[in-house]
């Protein structure tokens, strides 16, 4: 069981790292972008194969507000990733060129907003499962964090603030709704700064969904105790 959990964590970390790299497609060769995309797709399929119990439990049990939120985010993430995969095949110049598709125009219109929605939903998904990560860390350390917790909280606030700034500054919110045709690509920025910016954007959505989940949990407890 521990081995399976370790594999799950490894797959999730690899997916997140690959997704971050893929967001910087303008910094890499197009052929590499396509093959890394295929690797990300395979990891996504493996992730669902390892979490088969989620599919089996969809129609079981009661749906609290928290479970509705979690399920909605997960389903939307699956749909957005499916759109990313389909549009990737449509715009492919290398890996799927043998298919002879002539749908690049339509594929481009779908690919960027689908990717951006998937990116945001990955952050939301991480946040809704973040309590499990924190519990595992607490069990491992077996001590109260104290000053370390306060420092991490300050770091989180800074990361969320920076992520919010980057999300607005880069106009990523506009890409969610196709409010502009061209993506904001700064070819002069360094790779470390780009990765730091997008990690902060993920932190923004992760923190948002984590604290929303906590709010729904506390609300449920207060209703039960009333």
Task: Annotate each PLM feature.
Residues 1-226:
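Membrane-embedded alpha-helical bundles that constitute the cytochrome b-like, heme-associated redox core
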């Amino acid at each position: 069981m521990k081995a399976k959990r370790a594999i799950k964590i490894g797959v999730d970390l690899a997916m997140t790292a690959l997704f971050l790299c893929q967001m910087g497609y303008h910094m890499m060769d197009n052929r590499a972008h396509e093959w890394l995309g295929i690797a990300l797709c395979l990891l996504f399929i493996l992730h669902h194969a390892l979490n088969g119990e989620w599919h089996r439990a969809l129609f079981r049990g009661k749906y609290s507000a928290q479970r509705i939120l979690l399920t909605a985010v997960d389903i939307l993430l699956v749909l957005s990733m499916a759109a990313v995969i389909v549009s990737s095949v449509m715009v492919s110049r290398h890996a799927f060129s043998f298919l002879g598709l002539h749908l690049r125009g339509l594929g481009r219109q779908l690919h960027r907003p689908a990717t951006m929605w998937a990116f945001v939903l990955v952050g939301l998904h991480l946040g809704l499962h973040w309590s499990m990560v924190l519990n595992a860390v607490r069990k491992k350390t077996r001590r109260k964090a104290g000053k370390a917790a306060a420092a991490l909280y300050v770091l989180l606030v800074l990361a969320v603030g920076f992520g919010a700034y980057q999300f607005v500054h880069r106009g990523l919110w506009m890409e969610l709704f196709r409010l502009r045709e061209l993506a904001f690509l700064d070819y002069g920025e360094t790779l470390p700064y780009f990765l730091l910016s997008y990690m902060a954007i993920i932190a923004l959505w992760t923190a948002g969904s984590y604290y929303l989940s906590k709010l729904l949990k506390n609300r449920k407890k207060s209703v039960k105790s009333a």
